[in-house]
Amino acid sequence: MAIKVLVVDDSSFFRRRVSEIVNQDPELEVIATASNGAEAVKMTADLNPQVITMDIEMPVMDGITAVREIMAKCPTPILMFSSLTHDGAKATLDALDAGALDFLPKRFEDIATNKDEAILLLQQRVKALGRRRIFRPITRPSVAPVTPRPTTGSAVGNATTPVQSASAPVRSSPLSSIRASGKQYKLLLIGTSTGGPVALQKVLTQFPANYPHPILLIQHMPAAFTPAFASRLNGLCKIEVKEAANGDILRPGCAYLAPGGMQMMVERAGVTGRIKVLAGSAEMNYKPCVDITFASASKAYGGDVLAVVLTGMGADGREGARMLKAAGATIWAQDEASCVVYGMPQAVASTGIATQSISLDNMAESILKESARG
């Protein structure tokens, strides 16, 4: 049975365009369209769509308000459309905080190499959300106010890798069973995609300011969004969070977010770690790419790495995690039940690369426990 989709946008042209693309896929069916947030809230209650695509700026009721109301009344997976501007990035992050699960630039052909790829990209994102077995809104972290620090750095998820099917679900480890290995680490890596902004916020806001290791964050995200996302995390977290810049020296208690549209690598000069930011190759599906950062860390840090793969579509991170494991590093994955899309974590869990499958609720405490001896 086709996944039922509600398309919401104040532009009749965009409603028609999105509907045509969605309906080209036999696994998808647009059951209705709405021209503002108020209509979307009512139609969601009346029609029970499985996925909603939502614009942000609309008359009567904007998209962010509509997301909040839908999540309060009849929670449904929502894909936001956003402009590639600073204000658009901020609004999109607000929508994700309100409960939306994923986003695409409104001109989504800008993050694809051709028209066919753009069509496939939208279809896959909608299907990824519609395939969730049970929709449960992710519990938003309760964050005590932290005095924001200025971000010290400067200022796309454009892959069309099919969603990985969970053919052999991996059992999640309860928190009580997760024991610190006693290993000594020098670096924490976290890679993620769909659902990652909320997941990263939930994990990182629980870290103390004196977290003992540098942290590299690889989130599939357009270049226009990563500065705003790093700034937002920096204001919410006790640790420092910045967008990575070429030549940054790694410091304990600082998280470095890979810039959108670029590749982030790490190298060692004696005991000092240093970031290299390089232009992303046109042939690479992911910019930034988890595999590239993980692979560079395997060469620079060997087994002194704890690498975590969080929610995301596709299999980015699997090959880099394989290299890390061969070097002696520890690999963890988010469990299926707490993922927005169980693609990237499943790719490392079902192949035996990950040694633990941990729920998002338990991930921060598990990382802190494992890092304590570092």
From Swiss-Prot:
GO BP of this protein: chemotaxis
Pfam families assigned to the protein according to its UniProt record, in alphabetical order: CheB_methylest, Response_reg
Post-translational modification summary for this protein: Phosphorylated by CheA. Phosphorylation of the N-terminal regulatory domain activates the methylesterase activity.
Residue ranges, annotated region (Disordered): 141-170
GO terms of molecular function: phosphorelay response regulator activity; protein-glutamate methylesterase activity; protein-glutamine glutaminase activity
CDD domains per UniProt: CheB_Rec (cd16432), REC_CheB-like (cd17541)
Reaction it catalyzes: [protein]-L-glutamate 5-O-methyl ester + H2O = L-glutamyl-[protein] + methanol + H(+); L-glutaminyl-[protein] + H2O = L-glutamyl-[protein] + NH4(+)
Domain Response regulatory: from-to ranges: 4-121
Described function: Involved in chemotaxis. Part of a chemotaxis signal transduction system that modulates chemotaxis in response to various stimuli. Catalyzes the demethylation of specific methylglutamate residues introduced into the chemoreceptors (methyl-accepting chemotaxis proteins or MCP) by CheR. Also mediates the irreversible deamidation of specific glutamine residues to glutamic acid.
Comment, domains: Contains a C-terminal catalytic domain, and an N-terminal region which modulates catalytic activity.
Alphabetized HAMAP family for the sequence: CheB_chemtxs
Protein's UniProt name: Protein-glutamate methylesterase/protein-glutamine glutaminase 1
Species, as recorded: Shewanella oneidensis (strain ATCC 700550 / JCM 31522 / CIP 106686 / LMG 19005 / NCIMB 14063 / MR-1)
